[in-house]
């Protein structure tokens, strides 16, 4: 029986991994410009870490966990997201006492959620994210939103919409949630079974439900701004005012909530309008969060972060950009001589690779016409032809694939001639 990959996973190779690596390089470059430092945390953590900090009623905890017990009967879980893992690492390693504020980190790695696979959504998925820890000014949070927008700009992704909301403190949100419970109980019969179960557990999830969220009575539900304190209203107004001076266009969406319990204050989502992202259109999302550092054993610090799914970002990138695969080599070496000649050809390859040229060498085909035919698979800029006669005369034939011109070069001049060729070809 053939063993295949598990449902909701995928193999990454060929052109897709080239796109992945291109985006990864852009993300790392932008992270550096924002003075963000890379952090890596374990792929699995203690299950309690997520239950306490994501929220027992969240979909992740109730439906999507990949959890297990190890041989010592400890309850562990594959990470479904990485914010709490980063905060756990920061607190455990006392990084809050050895770094200037705000601490700025970025991460990229696999996450795991047991959910129905669809376009841009898998059970194992790659997530990039940033965390600003110890934020003291709302402008740092706007800077985080600009970071997200810069990613799209650098990747030439233009078909998107920025949505923002202000959801107040955790205490304010509790008042809002209690009001939503009473409100949605009046419409219980018009809700799906999932939403009925959410009324008491987490009615905020009804607002972004793919079916119920679009119903008129859901859109008319109580809004968070009705429960904000005077200070929160002032901060919300200031957030919008500052954002307007920096971002050309965005939508204030009073129904926007994030899926995890630790969020408070300003939140945002960037929604792709690409046709390739059917069913899942949010490509970047995040906002302010508090209580996590305190919950994990330190003082309470205001933090801000966002995350994006690489798979969704790749789909959005592909929709607007033509990707030219880099499957060509710089130099193809056609070795058509004896073993002694082949060893010299191998030495050519090693010398050129040490100079950072991309090289393919073929030892199997002994007829030059077959070597030329085979070289077409690699689209080389130069072909080096080396056989027994060349070995005897200490020379090699260089074929320029652009002009189809052949030149006979002495072996001791080869590296310089190759260098001259690529410098003139820039």
Swiss-Prot record:
Main enzyme class: ligase
Record Pfam families: HGTP_anticodon, tRNA-synt_His
EC code(s) of this entry: 6.1.1.21
Single Gene Ontology MF annotation: histidine-tRNA ligase activity
Catalytic activity field: tRNA(His) + L-histidine + ATP = L-histidyl-tRNA(His) + AMP + diphosphate + H(+)
Example GO biological process: histidyl-tRNA aminoacylation
Gene Ontology cellular-component terms listed: cytoplasm
InterPro entries, sorted: aa-tRNA-synth_II, aa-tRNA-synth_II/BPL/LPL, Anticodon-bd, Anticodon-bd_dom_sf, His-tRNA-ligase, HisRS-like_core, HisRS/HisZ
Subcellular location: Cytoplasm
SUPFAM superfamilies to which the protein is assigned, alphabetical: Class II aaRS ABD-related, Class II aaRS and biotin synthetases
Keywords associated with the record: Aminoacyl-tRNA synthetase, ATP-binding, Cytoplasm, Ligase, Nucleotide-binding, Protein biosynthesis
Alphabetical list of PANTHER family matching this protein: HISTIDINE--TRNA LIGASE, MITOCHONDRIAL-RELATED (PTHR43707:SF1), HISTIDYL-TRNA SYNTHETASE (PTHR43707)
HAMAP family: His_tRNA_synth
Family: Belongs to the class-II aminoacyl-tRNA synthetase family.
Subunit text: Homodimer.
Alphabetical list of NCBIfam families matching this protein: hisS
Protein name: Histidine--tRNA ligase
Natural source organism: Malacoplasma penetrans (strain HF-2) (Mycoplasma penetrans)
């Amino acid at each position: 029986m053939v063993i295949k990959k598990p449902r909701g996973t995928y193999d990454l190779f060929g052109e897709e991994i080239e796109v992945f690596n291109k985006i990864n390089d852009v993300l790392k470059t932008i992270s550096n410009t924002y003075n963000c430092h890379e952090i890596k945390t374990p792929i699995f953590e203690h299950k309690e870490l997520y239950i306490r900090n994501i929220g027992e009623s969240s979909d992740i905890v109730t439906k999507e966990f990949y959890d297990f017990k190890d041989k010592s009967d400890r309850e562990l879980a594959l990470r479904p997201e990485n914010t709490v893992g980063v905060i756990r690492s920061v607190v455990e390693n006392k990084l809050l006492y050895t770094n200037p504020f705000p601490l700025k980190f970025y991460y990229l790695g696999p996450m795991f959620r047991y959910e129905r696979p669809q376009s841009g959504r898998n059970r194992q998925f790659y997530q990039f994210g940033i965390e600003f820890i110890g934020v003291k000014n709302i402008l740092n949070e706007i800077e985080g939103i600009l970071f997200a927008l810069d990613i799209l700009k650098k990747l030439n992704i233009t078909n998107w919409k920025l949505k923002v909301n202000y959801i107040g403190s955790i205490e304010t949100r509790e008042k809002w949630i209690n009001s939503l419970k009473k409100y949605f109980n009046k419409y219980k019969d018009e809700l799906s079974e999932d939403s009925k179960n959410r009324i008491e557990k987490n009615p905020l999830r009804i607002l972004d439900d793919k079916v119920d969220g679009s119903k008129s009575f859901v859109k008319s539900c109580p809004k968070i701004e009705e429960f904000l304190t005077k200070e929160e209203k002032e901060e919300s107004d200031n957030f919008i005012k500052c954002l307007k001076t920096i971002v050309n266009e965005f939508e204030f969406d009073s129904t926007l909530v994030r899926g995890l319990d630790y969020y408070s204050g300003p939140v945002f989502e960037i929604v792709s309008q690409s046709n390739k992202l059917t069913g899942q259109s949010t490509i970047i999302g995040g906002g302010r969060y508090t209580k996590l550092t305190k919950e994990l054993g330190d003082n309470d610090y205001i933090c801000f972060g966002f995350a994006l799914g690489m798979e969704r970002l790749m789909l959005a990138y592909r929709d607007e950009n033509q990707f030219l695969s880099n499957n060509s080599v710089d130099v193809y070496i056609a070795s058509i001589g004896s073993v002694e000649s082949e060893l010299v050809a191998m030495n050519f390859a090693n010398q050129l690779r040490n100079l950072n040229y991309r090289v393919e060498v073929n030892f199997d085909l002994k007829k030059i016409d077959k070597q030329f035919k085979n070289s077409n698979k690699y689209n080389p800029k130069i072909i080096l032809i080396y056989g027994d006669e060349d070995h005897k005369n200490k020379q090699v034939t260089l074929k320029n694939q652009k002009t189809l011109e052949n030149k006979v070069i002495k072996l001791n001049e080869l590296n310089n001639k190759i260098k001259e060729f690529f410098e003139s070809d820039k």
